[in-house]
Protein backbone atom coordinates (compact mmCIF):
# COMPACT_ATOMS: atom_id res chain seq x y z
CA UNK A 1 0.00 0.00 0.00
CA UNK A 2 1.40 3.42 -1.01
CA UNK A 3 0.64 6.13 1.53
CA UNK A 4 0.18 9.65 0.22
CA UNK A 5 1.26 12.14 2.86
CA UNK A 6 -1.05 15.07 3.46
CA UNK A 7 0.04 18.68 3.92
CA UNK A 8 1.68 19.52 7.26
CA UNK A 9 -0.24 21.63 9.73
CA UNK A 10 0.88 25.23 10.13
CA UNK A 11 4.11 25.56 12.06
CA UNK A 12 3.48 27.24 15.37
CA UNK A 13 3.71 26.51 19.06
CA UNK A 14 0.79 24.47 20.37
CA UNK A 15 -0.63 24.14 23.85
CA UNK A 16 -0.47 20.45 24.74
CA UNK A 17 -1.80 18.52 27.72
CA UNK A 18 0.08 15.32 28.50
CA UNK A 19 -1.84 12.96 30.78
CA UNK A 20 0.53 11.02 33.01
CA UNK A 21 4.10 11.50 34.25
CA UNK A 22 5.32 7.94 33.82
CA UNK A 23 7.98 6.97 31.25
CA UNK A 24 5.78 7.62 28.21
CA UNK A 25 4.48 10.92 29.58
CA UNK A 26 7.91 12.21 30.57
CA UNK A 27 9.52 11.49 27.22
CA UNK A 28 6.49 13.01 25.47
CA UNK A 29 6.90 16.18 27.52
CA UNK A 30 10.61 16.28 26.71
CA UNK A 31 10.06 15.96 22.95
CA UNK A 32 7.20 18.46 22.90
CA UNK A 33 9.33 20.92 24.86
CA UNK A 34 12.19 20.50 22.37
CA UNK A 35 9.81 21.43 19.57
CA UNK A 36 8.80 24.62 21.36
CA UNK A 37 5.29 23.61 22.41
CA UNK A 38 3.70 24.82 25.63
CA UNK A 39 3.28 21.68 27.71
CA UNK A 40 1.27 20.90 30.82
CA UNK A 41 1.65 17.41 32.30
CA UNK A 42 -1.13 16.30 34.62
CA UNK A 43 -0.18 13.59 37.11
CA UNK A 44 -2.57 12.12 39.66
CA UNK A 45 0.17 11.08 42.09
CA UNK A 46 2.62 13.14 44.16
CA UNK A 47 5.68 12.39 42.04
CA UNK A 48 6.85 11.16 38.65
CA UNK A 49 7.20 7.50 37.73
CA UNK A 50 3.70 6.34 36.87
CA UNK A 51 3.58 2.59 37.30
CA UNK A 52 7.09 2.69 38.79
CA UNK A 53 6.06 4.91 41.70
CA UNK A 54 5.58 2.15 44.26
CA UNK A 55 2.46 2.47 46.40
CA UNK A 56 2.63 0.18 49.46
CA UNK A 57 -0.92 0.92 50.59
CA UNK A 58 -3.66 -0.76 48.57
CA UNK A 59 -7.45 -0.57 48.41
CA UNK A 60 -8.54 -3.41 50.69
CA UNK A 61 -12.20 -2.72 49.90
CA UNK A 62 -11.77 -3.25 46.16
CA UNK A 63 -9.50 -6.27 45.90
CA UNK A 64 -10.58 -7.05 42.34
CA UNK A 65 -10.37 -3.49 41.02
CA UNK A 66 -13.95 -3.25 39.85
CA UNK A 67 -14.55 0.43 40.63
CA UNK A 68 -14.48 2.97 37.82
CA UNK A 69 -11.93 5.18 39.55
CA UNK A 70 -9.12 3.24 41.18
CA UNK A 71 -7.56 4.62 44.34
CA UNK A 72 -4.19 3.03 43.57
CA UNK A 73 -2.49 3.40 40.17
CA UNK A 74 0.66 1.31 40.55
CA UNK A 75 0.59 -2.48 40.32
CA UNK A 76 4.25 -2.88 41.30
CA UNK A 77 4.91 -5.34 44.13
CA UNK A 78 7.69 -4.87 46.65
CA UNK A 79 10.11 -7.48 45.30
CA UNK A 80 9.63 -6.71 41.61
CA UNK A 81 12.79 -6.61 39.52
CA UNK A 82 13.14 -5.71 35.87
CA UNK A 83 12.68 -8.53 33.38
CA UNK A 84 15.06 -6.91 30.87
CA UNK A 85 18.68 -5.90 31.50
CA UNK A 86 19.16 -2.23 32.28
CA UNK A 87 21.43 -1.73 29.25
CA UNK A 88 18.54 -2.09 26.79
CA UNK A 89 16.05 0.11 28.61
CA UNK A 90 17.45 3.63 28.42
CA UNK A 91 16.23 6.42 26.17
CA UNK A 92 18.36 7.16 23.09
CA UNK A 93 20.40 9.92 24.74
CA UNK A 94 20.16 8.90 28.40
CA UNK A 95 21.59 5.44 29.20
CA UNK A 96 20.31 3.59 32.23
CA UNK A 97 23.74 3.20 33.80
CA UNK A 98 24.57 2.02 37.31
CA UNK A 99 25.41 4.78 39.77
CA UNK A 100 27.48 4.66 42.92
CA UNK A 101 25.46 3.99 46.03
CA UNK A 102 22.44 2.71 44.11
CA UNK A 103 21.18 -0.66 42.89
CA UNK A 104 23.87 -1.62 40.36
CA UNK A 105 22.43 -5.00 39.36
CA UNK A 106 21.80 -5.66 35.66
CA UNK A 107 18.20 -6.46 36.54
CA UNK A 108 17.59 -3.95 39.32
CA UNK A 109 14.56 -3.50 41.50
CA UNK A 110 11.75 -1.12 40.68
CA UNK A 111 13.19 1.57 42.97
CA UNK A 112 16.21 1.94 40.68
CA UNK A 113 14.09 2.52 37.59
CA UNK A 114 12.12 5.17 39.45
CA UNK A 115 15.39 6.95 40.30
CA UNK A 116 16.37 6.78 36.61
CA UNK A 117 13.10 8.48 35.66
CA UNK A 118 13.63 11.13 38.34
CA UNK A 119 17.13 11.75 36.94
CA UNK A 120 15.66 12.05 33.43
CA UNK A 121 13.08 14.50 34.71
CA UNK A 122 15.70 16.64 36.45
CA UNK A 123 18.27 16.70 33.66
CA UNK A 124 15.76 17.82 31.04
CA UNK A 125 13.91 20.29 33.24
CA UNK A 126 10.54 18.57 33.09
CA UNK A 127 9.32 18.98 36.65
CA UNK A 128 8.34 22.61 36.09
CA UNK A 129 5.77 21.44 33.52
CA UNK A 130 4.12 18.89 35.80
CA UNK A 131 1.09 19.43 38.00
CA UNK A 132 1.10 16.79 40.71
CA UNK A 133 -1.91 15.44 42.63
CA UNK A 134 -4.19 16.36 39.73
CA UNK A 135 -6.62 13.80 38.34
CA UNK A 136 -7.97 14.25 34.82
CA UNK A 137 -11.73 13.69 34.90
CA UNK A 138 -12.75 14.63 31.36
CA UNK A 139 -11.18 15.12 27.94
CA UNK A 140 -13.44 16.06 25.04
CA UNK A 141 -13.61 18.14 21.90
CA UNK A 142 -14.59 21.77 22.37
CA UNK A 143 -16.19 21.87 18.92
CA UNK A 144 -17.65 18.39 19.25
CA UNK A 145 -20.78 19.21 17.25
CA UNK A 146 -18.68 19.87 14.17
CA UNK A 147 -18.51 16.60 12.24
CA UNK A 148 -15.91 17.84 9.74
CA UNK A 149 -12.99 15.47 10.27
CA UNK A 150 -10.60 17.94 8.65
CA UNK A 151 -11.47 20.70 11.08
CA UNK A 152 -8.86 21.44 13.72
CA UNK A 153 -10.17 20.24 17.06
CA UNK A 154 -9.45 21.88 20.36
CA UNK A 155 -9.76 19.92 23.56
CA UNK A 156 -11.42 20.67 26.86
CA UNK A 157 -9.58 19.11 29.80
CA UNK A 158 -11.33 19.03 33.16
CA UNK A 159 -9.14 18.15 36.11
CA UNK A 160 -9.51 17.95 39.87
CA UNK A 161 -6.83 18.83 42.38
CA UNK A 162 -6.34 16.86 45.58
CA UNK A 163 -7.92 19.80 47.40
CA UNK A 164 -11.10 19.31 45.38
CA UNK A 165 -10.61 22.38 43.20
CA UNK A 166 -11.90 21.80 39.66
CA UNK A 167 -10.16 23.29 36.64
CA UNK A 168 -11.35 23.49 33.03
CA UNK A 169 -8.82 24.37 30.34
CA UNK A 170 -8.66 24.31 26.55
CA UNK A 171 -5.64 22.83 24.74
CA UNK A 172 -4.70 22.50 21.10
CA UNK A 173 -3.72 18.87 21.60
CA UNK A 174 -3.83 16.06 24.13
CA UNK A 175 -1.33 13.22 24.52
CA UNK A 176 -2.70 10.27 26.49
CA UNK A 177 0.17 8.62 28.37
CA UNK A 178 -1.73 7.27 31.36
CA UNK A 179 -0.50 3.68 31.20
CA UNK A 180 -2.37 0.38 31.01
CA UNK A 181 -1.31 -1.69 34.01
CA UNK A 182 -3.85 -0.49 36.57
CA UNK A 183 -7.32 -1.77 35.69
CA UNK A 184 -7.51 -5.54 36.37
CA UNK A 185 -8.63 -7.88 33.62
CA UNK A 186 -10.54 -10.74 35.25
CA UNK A 187 -11.59 -14.14 33.92
CA UNK A 188 -15.17 -15.36 33.93
CA UNK A 189 -15.37 -18.41 36.20
CA UNK A 190 -18.49 -20.27 37.27
CA UNK A 191 -19.22 -19.52 40.92
CA UNK A 192 -16.76 -16.65 41.13
CA UNK A 193 -19.32 -14.21 42.53
CA UNK A 194 -20.47 -16.69 45.19
CA UNK A 195 -17.05 -17.81 46.43
CA UNK A 196 -16.90 -16.55 50.02
CA UNK A 197 -13.18 -16.65 50.65
CA UNK A 198 -10.50 -14.14 49.70
CA UNK A 199 -10.15 -13.14 46.05
CA UNK A 200 -7.79 -10.48 44.79
CA UNK A 201 -6.02 -9.36 41.64
CA UNK A 202 -2.25 -8.99 41.49
CA UNK A 203 -2.85 -5.23 41.12
CA UNK A 204 -3.07 -5.05 44.92
CA UNK A 205 -0.45 -7.71 45.73
CA UNK A 206 2.57 -6.20 47.47
CA UNK A 207 4.25 -8.66 49.87
CA UNK A 208 3.86 -12.41 50.61
CA UNK A 209 3.48 -12.27 54.41
CA UNK A 210 -0.35 -11.95 54.47
CA UNK A 211 -0.54 -15.38 52.79
CA UNK A 212 1.49 -17.21 55.43
CA UNK A 213 0.34 -20.84 55.89
CA UNK A 214 -2.49 -20.39 53.38
CA UNK A 215 -3.51 -22.51 50.41
CA UNK A 216 -3.28 -20.06 47.52
CA UNK A 217 -4.46 -20.52 43.94
CA UNK A 218 -2.61 -18.29 41.49
CA UNK A 219 -4.54 -17.87 38.24
CA UNK A 220 -2.36 -16.99 35.27
CA UNK A 221 1.12 -18.01 34.22
CA UNK A 222 2.37 -14.67 32.95
CA UNK A 223 5.49 -12.97 34.28
CA UNK A 224 3.73 -11.70 37.41
CA UNK A 225 2.04 -15.05 38.00
CA UNK A 226 5.38 -16.83 37.88
CA UNK A 227 7.22 -14.27 40.01
CA UNK A 228 4.52 -14.13 42.67
CA UNK A 229 4.18 -17.93 42.80
CA UNK A 230 7.92 -18.27 43.38
CA UNK A 231 7.68 -15.73 46.19
CA UNK A 232 4.61 -17.29 47.80
CA UNK A 233 6.06 -20.81 48.06
CA UNK A 234 8.39 -19.51 50.78
CA UNK A 235 5.49 -18.61 53.13
CA UNK A 236 2.30 -20.34 51.94
CA UNK A 237 1.28 -23.86 52.88
CA UNK A 238 0.53 -24.66 49.25
CA UNK A 239 0.57 -22.71 45.99
CA UNK A 240 -1.51 -23.98 43.08
CA UNK A 241 -0.72 -22.38 39.73
CA UNK A 242 -3.61 -22.52 37.25
CA UNK A 243 -2.67 -22.00 33.60
CA UNK A 244 -4.31 -22.17 30.18
CA UNK A 245 -1.70 -24.62 28.92
CA UNK A 246 0.19 -27.31 30.80
CA UNK A 247 2.91 -27.08 28.16
CA UNK A 248 5.15 -24.88 30.27
CA UNK A 249 8.71 -23.64 29.65
CA UNK A 250 11.67 -25.54 31.13
CA UNK A 251 12.41 -22.81 33.66
CA UNK A 252 8.98 -23.12 35.26
CA UNK A 253 9.27 -26.91 35.28
CA UNK A 254 12.51 -26.59 37.25
CA UNK A 255 10.81 -24.33 39.79
CA UNK A 256 7.93 -26.79 40.29
CA UNK A 257 10.36 -29.69 40.70
CA UNK A 258 12.32 -27.71 43.28
CA UNK A 259 9.37 -26.65 45.45
CA UNK A 260 7.22 -29.47 46.78
CA UNK A 261 4.41 -27.09 47.74
CA UNK A 262 4.04 -25.65 44.23
CA UNK A 263 1.55 -27.47 42.00
CA UNK A 264 0.48 -26.97 38.38
CA UNK A 265 -3.16 -27.19 37.26
CA UNK A 266 -5.23 -26.50 34.15
CA UNK A 267 -7.83 -23.74 34.16
CA UNK A 268 -10.51 -23.54 36.84
CA UNK A 269 -13.83 -25.17 35.99
CA UNK A 270 -15.77 -23.75 38.94
CA UNK A 271 -15.58 -22.22 42.39
CA UNK A 272 -17.79 -23.69 45.11
CA UNK A 273 -19.28 -21.85 48.09
CA UNK A 274 -17.59 -24.24 50.54
CA UNK A 275 -14.14 -23.09 49.37
CA UNK A 276 -13.45 -25.83 46.84
CA UNK A 277 -11.69 -24.97 43.60
CA UNK A 278 -12.45 -27.48 40.84
CA UNK A 279 -10.12 -27.61 37.86
CA UNK A 280 -10.92 -28.67 34.30
CA UNK A 281 -9.22 -32.05 34.77
CA UNK A 282 -11.57 -32.83 37.68
CA UNK A 283 -8.99 -32.30 40.40
CA UNK A 284 -10.06 -30.29 43.41
CA UNK A 285 -8.50 -28.41 46.31
CA UNK A 286 -9.85 -26.28 49.14
CA UNK A 287 -8.25 -22.84 49.00
CA UNK A 288 -8.00 -19.86 51.32
CA UNK A 289 -7.20 -17.32 48.62
CA UNK A 290 -7.43 -16.93 44.86
CA UNK A 291 -4.95 -14.50 43.34
CA UNK A 292 -5.68 -13.46 39.75
CA UNK A 293 -2.55 -12.67 37.73
CA UNK A 294 -4.61 -12.26 34.59
CA UNK A 295 -3.42 -8.98 33.14
CA UNK A 296 -4.95 -5.58 32.70
CA UNK A 297 -7.56 -3.68 30.71
CA UNK A 298 -6.93 -0.63 28.59
CA UNK A 299 -9.18 2.05 30.03
CA UNK A 300 -9.43 5.79 29.57
CA UNK A 301 -12.44 6.71 31.71
CA UNK A 302 -11.82 10.41 31.19
CA UNK A 303 -11.91 10.33 27.37
CA UNK A 304 -14.99 11.34 25.39
CA UNK A 305 -14.17 11.01 21.70
CA UNK A 306 -17.74 10.65 20.37
CA UNK A 307 -17.02 7.03 19.45
CA UNK A 308 -13.92 7.78 17.41
CA UNK A 309 -11.69 5.87 19.83
CA UNK A 310 -13.22 2.84 21.49
CA UNK A 311 -12.03 -0.22 23.37
CA UNK A 312 -13.27 -3.59 22.17
CA UNK A 313 -11.90 -6.69 23.90
CA UNK A 314 -8.76 -4.76 24.90
CA UNK A 315 -8.23 -3.38 21.40
CA UNK A 316 -7.93 0.41 21.45
CA UNK A 317 -8.98 1.69 18.10
CA UNK A 318 -8.96 2.54 15.45
CA UNK A 319 -5.40 3.80 15.96
CA UNK A 320 -2.90 4.27 13.16
CA UNK A 321 0.34 2.62 14.28
CA UNK A 322 -1.11 2.30 17.80
CA UNK A 323 -0.77 6.07 18.18
CA UNK A 324 -3.19 8.24 16.18
CA UNK A 325 -6.96 8.33 15.79
CA UNK A 326 -7.32 8.89 12.01
CA UNK A 327 -10.12 11.44 12.34
CA UNK A 328 -8.58 13.29 15.29
CA UNK A 329 -4.87 13.20 14.49
CA UNK A 330 -2.51 14.67 15.35
CA UNK A 331 -4.41 16.56 18.03
CA UNK A 332 -5.28 13.40 19.97
CA UNK A 333 -2.55 10.80 20.34
CA UNK A 334 -1.57 7.89 22.57
CA UNK A 335 1.92 6.99 23.78
CA UNK A 336 2.80 3.68 25.38
CA UNK A 337 -0.04 1.44 24.21
CA UNK A 338 2.00 -1.31 22.48
CA UNK A 339 3.34 -4.15 24.63
CA UNK A 340 6.05 -6.78 24.24
CA UNK A 341 8.71 -4.52 22.78
CA UNK A 342 11.65 -2.54 24.12
CA UNK A 343 9.50 0.14 25.65
CA UNK A 344 11.47 3.29 26.36
CA UNK A 345 13.06 3.77 22.90
CA UNK A 346 9.70 3.04 21.29
CA UNK A 347 7.89 5.56 23.50
CA UNK A 348 10.56 8.07 22.50
CA UNK A 349 9.96 7.49 18.79
CA UNK A 350 6.22 7.94 19.34
CA UNK A 351 6.83 11.18 21.21
CA UNK A 352 9.16 12.54 18.53
CA UNK A 353 6.60 11.81 15.81
CA UNK A 354 3.80 13.53 17.71
CA UNK A 355 5.93 16.58 18.53
CA UNK A 356 7.10 17.02 14.93
CA UNK A 357 3.57 16.61 13.58
CA UNK A 358 2.31 19.34 15.88
CA UNK A 359 5.20 21.55 14.74
CA UNK A 360 4.28 21.05 11.10
CA UNK A 361 7.62 19.40 10.31
CA UNK A 362 6.06 16.19 9.05
CA UNK A 363 2.66 14.85 8.05
CA UNK A 364 0.41 11.82 8.29
CA UNK A 365 -1.36 9.94 5.52
CA UNK A 366 -4.96 10.90 4.85
CA UNK A 367 -7.65 9.71 7.23
CA UNK A 368 -8.90 7.20 4.65
CA UNK A 369 -5.41 5.80 4.10
CA UNK A 370 -4.81 5.46 7.82
CA UNK A 371 -8.11 3.60 8.20
CA UNK A 372 -7.13 1.26 5.37
CA UNK A 373 -3.75 0.62 6.98
CA UNK A 374 -5.47 -0.19 10.27
CA UNK A 375 -7.88 -2.57 8.53
CA UNK A 376 -4.99 -4.32 6.78
CA UNK A 377 -3.20 -4.69 10.13
CA UNK A 378 -6.28 -6.19 11.79
CA UNK A 379 -6.75 -8.67 8.94
CA UNK A 380 -3.10 -9.71 9.09
CA UNK A 381 -3.30 -10.30 12.84
CA UNK A 382 -6.46 -12.33 12.40
CA UNK A 383 -4.82 -14.41 9.66
CA UNK A 384 -1.95 -15.12 12.06
CA UNK A 385 -4.43 -16.37 14.66
CA UNK A 386 -3.78 -13.53 17.10
CA UNK A 387 -6.85 -12.79 19.26
CA UNK A 388 -8.29 -9.29 19.25
CA UNK A 389 -7.36 -8.86 22.92
CA UNK A 390 -3.69 -9.15 21.90
CA UNK A 391 -3.86 -6.51 19.17
CA UNK A 392 -1.21 -4.37 20.85
CA UNK A 393 1.20 -7.23 21.67
CA UNK A 394 3.97 -6.60 19.15
CA UNK A 395 6.83 -9.03 19.92
CA UNK A 396 8.72 -7.91 16.81
CA UNK A 397 11.90 -5.83 16.80
CA UNK A 398 11.33 -4.99 13.14
CA UNK A 399 8.15 -3.13 14.01
CA UNK A 400 10.11 -0.66 16.14
CA UNK A 401 12.44 -0.04 13.20
CA UNK A 402 9.54 0.41 10.78
CA UNK A 403 7.97 2.88 13.18
CA UNK A 404 11.21 4.83 13.53
CA UNK A 405 11.38 5.22 9.75
CA UNK A 406 8.34 7.49 9.80
CA UNK A 407 10.40 10.25 11.43
CA UNK A 408 13.98 9.29 10.69
CA UNK A 409 14.56 8.02 14.22
CA UNK A 410 17.49 5.57 14.40
CA UNK A 411 16.70 1.87 14.35
CA UNK A 412 17.16 -0.13 17.51
CA UNK A 413 20.82 -0.88 17.97
CA UNK A 414 21.67 -4.49 17.25
CA UNK A 415 23.10 -4.91 20.75
CA UNK A 416 19.74 -3.95 22.28
CA UNK A 417 18.01 -6.66 20.29
CA UNK A 418 20.66 -9.28 21.07
CA UNK A 419 20.78 -8.56 24.80
CA UNK A 420 17.00 -8.50 25.07
CA UNK A 421 16.69 -11.81 23.24
CA UNK A 422 19.45 -13.31 25.37
CA UNK A 423 17.55 -12.37 28.55
CA UNK A 424 14.31 -13.83 27.20
CA UNK A 425 15.96 -17.13 26.32
CA UNK A 426 17.72 -17.29 29.69
CA UNK A 427 14.43 -16.68 31.53
CA UNK A 428 12.77 -19.50 29.60
CA UNK A 429 15.46 -21.93 30.74
CA UNK A 430 16.28 -20.51 34.17
CA UNK A 431 13.22 -18.71 35.48
CA UNK A 432 14.30 -18.49 39.10
CA UNK A 433 17.89 -17.39 38.51
CA UNK A 434 18.14 -15.54 35.18
CA UNK A 435 18.24 -12.08 36.76
CA UNK A 436 21.38 -12.95 38.73
CA UNK A 437 23.07 -15.53 36.53
CA UNK A 438 23.64 -15.13 32.80
CA UNK A 439 25.96 -16.37 30.10
CA UNK A 440 26.15 -13.34 27.81
CA UNK A 441 29.13 -11.57 29.40
CA UNK A 442 30.90 -11.40 26.04
CA UNK A 443 27.88 -9.67 24.54
CA UNK A 444 27.67 -7.35 27.52
CA UNK A 445 31.32 -6.29 27.36
CA UNK A 446 31.02 -5.67 23.64
CA UNK A 447 27.87 -3.63 24.24
CA UNK A 448 29.52 -1.44 26.85
CA UNK A 449 32.10 -0.39 24.23
CA UNK A 450 29.36 1.03 22.02
CA UNK A 451 29.45 4.83 21.59
CA UNK A 452 26.07 4.93 23.32
CA UNK A 453 27.92 4.20 26.57
CA UNK A 454 31.43 5.52 25.84
CA UNK A 455 31.01 8.69 23.77
CA UNK A 456 27.57 10.02 24.59
CA UNK A 457 27.74 13.12 26.76
CA UNK A 458 25.55 12.10 29.68
CA UNK A 459 24.42 15.06 31.80
CA UNK A 460 25.21 14.67 35.47
CA UNK A 461 22.51 14.78 38.12
From Swiss-Prot:
Signal peptide: none annotated. InterPro entries: FAD/NAD-bd_sf (IPR036188), Flavin_mOase (IPR000960), Flavin_mOase-like (IPR020946), FMO-like (IPR050346). GO terms for molecular function: flavin adenine dinucleotide binding; N,N-dimethylaniline monooxygenase activity; NADP binding. Its cofactor is FAD. It holds the Pfam family FMO-like. Belongs to the FMO family. Catalyzes the conversion of methylthioalkyl glucosinolates of any chain length into methylsulfinylalkyl glucosinolates. This is Flavin-containing monooxygenase FMO GS-OX-like 8. It comes from Arabidopsis thaliana (Mouse-ear cress). The lineage of its organism: Eukaryota, Viridiplantae, Streptophyta, Embryophyta, Tracheophyta.
Amino acid sequence: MVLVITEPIKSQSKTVCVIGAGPSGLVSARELKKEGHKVVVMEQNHDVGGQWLYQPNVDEEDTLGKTKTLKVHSSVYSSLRLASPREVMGFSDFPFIAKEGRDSRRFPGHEELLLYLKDFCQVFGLREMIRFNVRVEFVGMVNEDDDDDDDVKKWMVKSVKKSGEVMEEVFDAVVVASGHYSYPRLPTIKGMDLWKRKQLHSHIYRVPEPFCDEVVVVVGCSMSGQDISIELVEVAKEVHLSTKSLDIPPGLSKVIEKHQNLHLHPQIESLEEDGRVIFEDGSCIVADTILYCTGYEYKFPFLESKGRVEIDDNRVGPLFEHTFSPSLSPFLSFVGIPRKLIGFPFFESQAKWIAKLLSGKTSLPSSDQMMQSISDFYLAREADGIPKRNTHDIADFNYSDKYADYIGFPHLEEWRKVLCLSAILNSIENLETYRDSWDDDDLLQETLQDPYFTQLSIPSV
